[in-house]
Amino acid sequence: MAAPMEVVVCTDAAAQLWSCVVWELHSGANLLTYRGGQAGPRGLALLNGEYLLAAQQGKNYICAWELQRKDQLQQKIMCPGPVTCLTTAPNGLYVLAGIAESIYLWEVCTGNLLVILSRHYQDVSCLKFTGDGSHFVSAGKDCLALAWSLCSVLQADPSRILAPRHVWSQHTLPITDLHCGFGGPMARVATASLDQTVKLWAISSGDLLLSVLFDMGITSVTMDLAEHHIFCGGSDGSIFQVDLCSWPGLREHSFQPEQNTGKVFKGHRNQVTCLSVSTDGSVLLSGSHDESVRLWDVKSKQCLRTVTLKGPVTNAAIILAPPSMLNPEFRPSLPLPHFNKHLLGAEHGDEAQGGGLRLQLGLHLQGKEPSYLERLEQLQAVLSSYLEKNMLGSQMLPARVFDLEDEVRSLRKINRDLFDFSTRIITRPSK
């Protein structure tokens, strides 16, 4: 079986020829292009391996394409305001969007707007789910990074104030990027800020594990899958590689480029906007405001390929191509529903029923659920059938007992005859 193909998905601010382009990582061959608008920074996401979502820069809607119907915009998801960042749950059940200082959470199978979280004081700049979808992290221009438990956010108690699991407030300038590692509730989160630091946090405890100081503002951050290295993109175009195993026990560290010349990638002429690492950790992808996307060999720090775009790069990531992306005959399992702009129950002025959420926890549970009266009728039918069988069985029981007793008497007679016959044979005198 062939290994999954790694592809690069990227967008730029100009969007003259296309909104999004997909090309093969190692050969650079163009595979797909999508048209329909300009995707904003950190506004690109795959939904369940079937749809591509792009938050339009400065506009109040999200474009959605089927992965194979690239020339036809499937849907525009209208939002209450311009979307500043976007992400989707790994299982494809939820969509998160940052709109101004609030976080909007939609359920994909129904399109219901479940929750609006308002704990940031300025615009939300980044949103990321953990690998298992149990938590998500938000960061904003208010210098705060918040770790949320999805289970707590979806709780249905209206009297309980929704609060993040952790509030990380050690940054002193706006947070520009964040990265969630693997491990679910044990994952580590890296945050980058204009205060010239990158900080590493533990979701499980909320502790600050490491703070690295640079000599410039950091505009992007990522880690390899093994989490041996943090890659930090600077405002001048430099990319720094921080080895997490180099300073055991140190909580704070200052990165000096002149002392770490073998840990700096040089080539971009403007700030680095996005970073991504290949699955095996050997290739680093970077996008910049200098209108170029570069592929780097991590070990040698050499630039392997440069792709020039028509505008500043807003999104660039290395992903494993889902089967639907490479299969021309593939169609989504379910169409996207209409996404509501108002909270569930509030769209029709139904405040009385706003205290609970009806959650469908699977993509294929679309459709009308039976009412309680219908469920009661089904239960009564099952109970009646069970009682009927029991009554019928109780009437046949005496006849069955009589048959078994008769069979036992017959077997006893056969056994006695067999015993008598054997005794006569054994005791017969020999001639």
Swiss-Prot record:
The name this protein goes by in its record:
WD repeat-containing protein 18
Family annotation (PROSITE patterns): WD_REPEATS_1, WD_REPEATS_2, WD_REPEATS_REGION
- What highest taxon heads this organism's lineage? Eukaryota
Q: Has keyword Repeat?
A: yes
Location in or out of the cell: Nucleus, Nucleolus; Nucleus, Nucleoplasm; Cytoplasm; Dynein axonemal particle
The reply on keyword Acyltransferase is no
Q: Which family does it belong to?
A: Belongs to the WD repeat IPI3/WDR18 family.
The family database entries (Pfam families) matched by this protein are listed as: WD40, WD40_alt
What role does it play? Functions as a component of the Five Friends of Methylated CHTOP (5FMC) complex; the 5FMC complex is recruited to ZNF148 by methylated CHTOP, leading to desumoylation of ZNF148 and subsequent transactivation of ZNF148 target genes. Component of the PELP1 complex involved in the nucleolar steps of 28S rRNA maturation and the subsequent nucleoplasmic transit of the pre-60S ribosomal subunit. May play a role during development.
Keyword annotations: Cytoplasm, Developmental protein, Nucleus, Repeat, WD repeat
Question: How does it associate, per the subunit comment?
Answer: Component of the 5FMC complex, at least composed of PELP1, LAS1L, TEX10, WDR18 and SENP3; the complex interacts with methylated CHTOP and ZNF148. Interacts with NOL9. Component of the PELP1 complex, composed of at least PELP1, TEX10 and WDR18. The complex interacts with pre-60S ribosome particles.
Spans of WD repeats, please give. Answer: 36-75, 78-116, 119-158, 170-211, 213-257, 267-306
Which InterPro entries does this entry report, sorted A to Z?
A: G-protein_beta_WD-40_rep, WD40/YVTN_repeat-like_dom_sf, WD40_repeat_CS, WD40_repeat_dom_sf, WD40_rpt, WDR18/Ipi3/RID3, Wdr18_C_dom
Gene Ontology CC annotations of this record? dynein axonemal particle; nucleolus; nucleoplasm
